[in-house]
């Protein structure tokens, strides 16, 4: 997608602080963190929202969760815990229409 912020980050057109990258997934620090540790984990394949995930994408989504697991261990946040959030659509607060998962950690998070 030409105008997608995350697609531009994937292509290297916009800089990011990468935490993890492979052929299918990119994880980077959020530029407006809401927690001391705030990582965005995204597929390199452009999928607008969770509602557009297909059966074909199921392995990719599973791999994203395994990547979240790895990042948590790499950052040492697996012991104290962390939150994973995926917003779906504008009314939920999704600002970038490219599926992404927020990893939030580094402090005790309030229940939502």
Q: What is the meaning of each model-derived region?
A:
Residues 1-112:
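HIT superfamily nucleotide-processing domains
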């Amino acid at each position: 997608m030409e105008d997608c912020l995350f697609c531009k980050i994937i292509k290297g057109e916009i800089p990011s602080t990468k935490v993890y990258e492979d052929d299918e997934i990119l994880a980077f620090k959020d530029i407006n963190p809401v927690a001391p540790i705030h990582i965005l984990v995204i597929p390199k394949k452009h999928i607008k929202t969770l509602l557009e995930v297909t059966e074909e994408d199921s392995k990719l989504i599973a791999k994203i969760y395994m990547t979240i697991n790895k990042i948590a261990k790499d950052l040492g946040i697996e012991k104290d815990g962390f939150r994973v959030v995926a917003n779906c659509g504008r009314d939920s607060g999704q600002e970038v229409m490219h599926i992404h998962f927020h990893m939030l950690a580094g402090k005790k998070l309030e229940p939502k």
